[in-house]
């Protein structure tokens, strides 16, 4: 989402000194909207004013007293700037904050100004604008041919990750996974066209192309060494990761330039490798609804909604990251499961800790604001309140003995000394602003106390003076008031102005009153304002010093925040496991997936826990590699398949699972092809989307992957679809080609013929009870294939008119397609079993993956026949047209445009051909 900016012409020669200053600063930050501080407002001029007035819905005006050629302008009050700033940033704009760097009262001539910070979507620190449970990542991408260096920084928490990728597909998957608020990159990425307009819009990305100086290798190395204060990069784990080093240096340079800050809260850099986590592409994340629902993009109804019972924002972000990056290391998975079991065994102590976590604010983001020097007094009070109960939590942690919880106990610091410092210094009712005073408690500093007394005494003297003047003049409604323009003044209504004494000096005339000053009143004013001004300055200095002292403890605080996040996340998984009756899964490395009484956790939760039908699943790498699942729509096939994928994924994040027993073989990837919708924005039809996804799965899956395939081939004509579905199953089943564990739901009952022909394919169906013309879905997976699709009965349940139902029943009798099934029974498969020769034959005859990629997902007429039709030279295989007298039928078939036929049309034509051939005695 890169915003087009307007381009007004500016007459530089005729600018006033102030506008010339504005112009010079704006030139340096031409890609930003410049917030130019003038008194109590941030003003915008020219193009910035035109843009901001529309986005912020504020009035566009001109400076008072200016001529008609004066620039358009608009402004926002400084005390409410965050609201307007966030609106612009969330709309994809960058904003440069230009402050007055000297007191206007002391300035000789034009007040000095400079940009103190640039706020962008990836560098926003305002917690009110950020999603609590989600990281706000800035992503740096260094593209070198098909290799990529990736750096991810969450400025609001200090988290810093780097990795390297070796394909554009994996790059898009990482972007989809981390959902960066902003991307900075080298020119190569832009030129490559990998990030299409459709992808950028879909992901709501703000992208900035940086100059070479940001990402040159030598400059990047210097930047990283300087920031982390190291002599070599090997100790940071970056050895041999040249592209990652360039991307890390790139984001650090960008942050230093935009934030004008030391970034002291970014204290570690963590290399990660995609091979350490289960790979989930964007389609799978959406189809499994891990963090948001597919339709409404809501958290409610997602897997995260079920699992997230965290009490802190830090714990919620960590739990979300578990879902986004399931583990593939058995020891790491078992360690997480041990932590959950530890909490389950001591529920009373667990609930005590949970209660203490409840008032904890977002320590990670508060710490970032403290280090940025942007934390206000109330932020420090929130920090203090967050650490108040840390000693109580620390005292309970020794009751747990699992490895992870012991590690958290070691990391956990009570931070009692910091609590005492804040408690001793800051007023409990301190204001938001650091420039309003009333921040520091009485008794903390002698000079503060003396100045407060002077200010209070001065105000008392003013009050006494008011009473004296009333008595002296006889003006009973006389009032002494104050404003920032005139200071203290005496106000008298017009009805009493004739009684005003000669020693008063008139200052202002109003419609109904007059305002006056006296020498004595001015004397008191100087006493009060002098004390107040010094008081505000001193309070700010003391507050800033305290804030810096806390920032110096960043390592202790950061470790404690991470421990709190981990404890909170695992308590959440423990609470859900207990309340939802989840069980601890066994983890194996032999590729066995054995689930007893499995449930879909989200569907069960939405149903209120009652009536969900449990189902078993068994898959392995030998005789139970592929399950062909048949049955009518609405019967529960998709729910069953998704539930299996979710149970596997939950096990690999280290969670207990919704089943009575589960033995889960570690999967390196989960792919789903479930449902489709036309991608109109990119001009892709349902079938093209489907075939593209299938091609992606077959290219990127491995023997250790889990595939969830629903209705492959349904987006085209019956024969095309059946051909493709058959060929895909053949391909997956062959361990020399793929051999992945697969749940394959289909309406093509002909595919049930593959059981017995392929040694690792088994048929399952959804049990249905028939009651006359009505059916009842039992939601139970049973062995065997379905012999009916029950489409007409489902149509009846959906409310299709009776006349349509009756006509459909008549047509069904006429269009009985058993002949197709008989042909399927006589088909032989290619590449069956584990034989090398079978695999070789299949590849030589052009396998399905080549077919899909070469045709872009759309079948070629010759290829579609090769996928299912036997080799004509093989006498053991079936020949549909073995006689020359049927050449006219063959010609008709060859000329038929299958992609334009509906299933009904296809069956009608097939029926006509069959009658013609049978009439000739074949």
Regions found by a protein language model. Give the residues of each.
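Charged catalytic and DNA/RNA-contacting regions of genome-maintenance
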Residues: 2-342, 358, 362-371, 375-467, ...
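Amphipathic alpha-helical transducer elements in NTP-driven molecular machines
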Residues: 15-19, 35, 46, 75-85, ...
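ATPase nucleotide-binding head domains, primarily ABC-like/P-loop NTPase cores
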Residues: 46-49, 241, 311-312, 322, ...
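Active-site phosphate-binding and catalytic loops of NTP-dependent enzymes
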Residues: 98, 121-130, 262, 398-404, ...
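Amphipathic heptad-repeat alpha-helical coiled-coil/stalk segments that mediate oligomerization
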Residues: 215-223, 278-282, 294, 385-460, ...
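Charged, surface-exposed helical/loop "interaction arms" that form contiguous linear patches used
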Residues: 362, 372, 376, 386-389, ...
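Extended, charged coiled-coil "arm/hinge" scaffolds of SMC/Rad50-like chromosome-maintenance ATPases
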Residues: 427, 510, 514-548
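C-terminal tails and terminal domains of large nucleic-acid-associated
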Residues: 883-922
């Amino acid at each position: 989402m890169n915003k087009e900016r307007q381009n007004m012409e500016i007459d530089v020669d005729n600018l006033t000194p102030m506008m010339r200053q504005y112009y010079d600063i704006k030139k340096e930050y031409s890609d930003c909207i410049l917030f130019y501080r003038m008194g109590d407002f941030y003003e915008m001029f020219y193009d910035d004013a035109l843009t901001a007035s529309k986005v912020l819905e504020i009035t566009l005006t001109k400076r008072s007293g200016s001529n008609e050629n004066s620039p358009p302008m608009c402004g926002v009050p400084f005390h409410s700037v965050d609201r307007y700033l966030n609106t612009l940033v969330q709309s994809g704009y960058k904003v440069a904050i230009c402050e007055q760097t000297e007191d206007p009262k002391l300035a000789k001539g034009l007040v000095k100004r400079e940009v103190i910070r640039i706020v962008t979507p990836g560098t926003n620190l305002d917690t009110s604008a950020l999603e609590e449970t989600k990281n706000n990542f800035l992503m740096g991408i260094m593209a070198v041919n098909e290799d990529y260096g990736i750096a991810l920084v969450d400025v609001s928490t200090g988290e810093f990750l780097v990795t390297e990728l070796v394909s554009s597909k994996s790059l898009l998957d990482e972007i989809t996974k981390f959902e960066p608020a902003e991307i900075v990159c080298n020119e190569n990425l832009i030129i490559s066209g990998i990030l299409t307009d459709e992808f950028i819009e879909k992901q709501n990305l703000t992208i900035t192309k940086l100059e070479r100086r940001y990402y040159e290798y030598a400059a990047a190395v210097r930047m990283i060494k300087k920031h982390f204060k190291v002599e070599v990069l090997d100790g940071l784990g970056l050895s041999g990761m040249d592209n990652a080093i360039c991307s890390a240096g790139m984001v650090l340079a960008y942050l230093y330039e935009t934030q004008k800050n030391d970034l002291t809260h970014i204290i570690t850099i963590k290399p990660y490798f995609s091979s350490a986590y289960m790979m989930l592409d964007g389609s799978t994340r959406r189809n499994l609804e891990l963090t948001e629902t597919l339709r409404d993009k809501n958290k409610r109804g997602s897997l995260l909604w079920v699992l997230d019972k965290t009490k802190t924002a830090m714990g919620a972000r960590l739990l979300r990251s578990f879902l986004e990056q399931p583990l593939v290391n058995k020891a790491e998975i078992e360690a997480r499961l041990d932590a959950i079991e530890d909490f389950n065994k001591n529920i009373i102590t667990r609930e005590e800790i949970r209660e203490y976590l409840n008032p904890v604010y977002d320590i990670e983001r508060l710490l970032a604001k403290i280090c940025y020097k942007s934390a206000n007094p109330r932020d420090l009070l929130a920090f203090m309140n967050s650490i108040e109960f840390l000693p109580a939590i620390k005292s309970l942690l020794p009751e747990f003995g699992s490895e992870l919880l012991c590690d958290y106990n070691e990391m956990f610091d009570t931070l009692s000394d910091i609590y005492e410092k804040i408690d001793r210094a800051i007023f409990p009712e301190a204001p938001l602003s650091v420039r309003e005073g009333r921040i520091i408690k009485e008794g903390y500093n002698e000079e503060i106390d003396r100045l407060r007394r002077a200010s209070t005494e001065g105000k008392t003297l003013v009050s006494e003076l008011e009473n004296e003047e009333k008595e002296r003049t006889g003006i009973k409604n006389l009032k002494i008031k104050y404003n920032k323009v005139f200071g203290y003044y005496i106000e008298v209504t017009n009805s009493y102005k004739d009684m005003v004494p000669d020693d008063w000096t008139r200052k202002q005339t109003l419609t109904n009153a007059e305002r006056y000053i006296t020498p004595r009143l001015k004397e008191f004013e100087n006493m009060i304002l002098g004390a107040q001004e010094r008081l505000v300055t001193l309070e700010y200095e003391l507050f800033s010093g305290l804030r810096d002292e806390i920032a110096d403890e960043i390592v202790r605080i950061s470790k404690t925040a991470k421990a709190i996040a981990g404890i909170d996340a695992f308590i959440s998984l423990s609470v859900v496991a207990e309340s939802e009756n989840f069980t601890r899964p066994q983890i194996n490395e032999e590729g066995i997936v054995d689930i007893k009484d499995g449930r879909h956790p989200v569907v069960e939760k939405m149903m209120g826990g009652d009536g969900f039908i449990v189902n078993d699943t068994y898959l392995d790498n030998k005789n139970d590699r592929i399950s062909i699942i048949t049955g009518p729509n609405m019967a529960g096939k998709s729910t069953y398949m998704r539930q299996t994928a979710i149970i596997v994924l939950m096990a690999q994040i280290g969670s207990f699972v919704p089943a009575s027993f589960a033995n889960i073989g570690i999967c390196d990837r989960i792919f789903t092809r479930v449902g489709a919708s036309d991608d109109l924005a990119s001009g892709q039809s349902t079938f093209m989307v489907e075939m593209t996804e299938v091609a992606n799965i077959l290219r990127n899956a491995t023997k250790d992957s889990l595939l969830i395939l629903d209705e492959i081939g349904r987006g085209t004509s019956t024969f095309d679809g059946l051909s493709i579905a058959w060929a895909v199953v053949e391909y997956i089943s062959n361990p020399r080609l793929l051999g992945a564990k697969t749940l394959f739901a289909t309406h093509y009952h002909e595919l049930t013929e593959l059981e017995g022909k392929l040694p690792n394919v088994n048929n399952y169906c959804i049990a249905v009870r028939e009651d006359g013309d009505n059916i009842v879905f039992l939601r139970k997976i049973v062995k065997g294939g379905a012999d009916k699709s029950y489409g007409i009965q489902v149509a009846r349940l959906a409310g299709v008119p009776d006349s349509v139902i009756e006509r459909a029943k008549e047509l069904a009798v006429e269009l009985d397609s058993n002949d197709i099934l008989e042909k399927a029974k006589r088909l032989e498969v290619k590449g069956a079993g584990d034989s090398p020769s079978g695999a070789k034959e299949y590849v030589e005859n052009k396998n399905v993956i080549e077919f899909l990629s070469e045709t872009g997902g759309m079948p070629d007429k010759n290829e579609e026949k090769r996928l299912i039709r036997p080799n004509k030279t093989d006498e053991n295989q079936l020949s549909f047209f073995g006689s020359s007298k049927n050449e006219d039928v063959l010609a008709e078939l060859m000329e038929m445009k299958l992609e334009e036929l509906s299933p009904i049309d296809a069956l009608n034509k097939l029926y006509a051909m069959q009658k013609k051939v049978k009439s000739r005695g074949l």
